[in-house]
């Protein structure tokens, strides 16, 4: 499969590749079966299995914010370790990484679990923190050093464009830095190259979205009006997903699948570069368009493929996109990822229809 999976993840992949589950069975399995969600606590303990994890985290958080309430900090750390919550701010993830002496790669993974993206090497703070992680520095050193740097120029999100190769060029430039003096020089020299939004993810988003806005290719000569964001939302993203904001009585799986589900406002903001592209949206666009944006032949369209072959092909394709965007790869023990992997094995219906059938069963009665 190209990516090493744990035994539990491998079991899920085998289950998905069997082709034996109807949408009703898939929904029931996610809701009531033996599906084992991978939580933040499991990932955290896999990166730092020692018994002093709670003490180290609490001490590090208090050192970073001496005015914090020790009881509140202790409660936050316990909730992380016991799987009741996870950090949602990348700043907190970096604090954890420094506290546990995690490597840059381990920090990248932890960020992906919490924020959709790994270290963003076009983000000024991220590259500084990554450098201090690589060189064995402390969180307070990294934070104070970053605070001493010149402010980044304000960039209008709608105009934040340019070569998508800049991120890798920046990463390579900072890998050549060997002292805080060089770090400051490199940072100042690249002030105009920094930005908050991810360009590669936006590139995929626009290609997929353009396919939905202009469903009839120009070369056909057929006339069809462009779809509005409202129409796209209704036609493609509704998928029988409950619109109510109330989640009272919902299961964990229901909450996870509903979380960050796109709406019209979100699509408009992302299109206008006012917000980043969420990982879930990118996966949904892959399913909705079936990754067909250029009309080229793809073997995944052929009926002779077995469910396993079809799943393998989409597994490689999706993971290549996610990796290119700086997002974590597919995890068969993630509820949304599992649903996406189930959808891409569709043969007699479209991927989005297959996904919608599962969602209908999962949210029946809501």
Question: What residues fall within each predicted segment?
Answer:
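Extended, solvent-exposed, polar/acidic, compositionally biased regions
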Residues: 22, 33, 353-366
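A generic alpha-helix surface/boundary motif
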Residues: 52-55, 90-94, 126
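Short amphipathic recognition helices of helix-turn-helix/homeodomain-type DNA-binding modules
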Residues: 28, 94, 104-159, 300-350, ...
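Short, basic-rich loop-to-helix N-cap that marks the start of a DNA-contacting helix
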Residues: 84-99
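Recognition helix of helix-turn-helix/homeodomain-like DNA-binding domains
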Residues: 62-88, 113-116
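A short, Lys/Arg-rich alpha-helix, primarily the initiator
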Residues: 2-63, 145-156
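Long, charge-rich C-terminal accessory regions
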Residues: 158-330
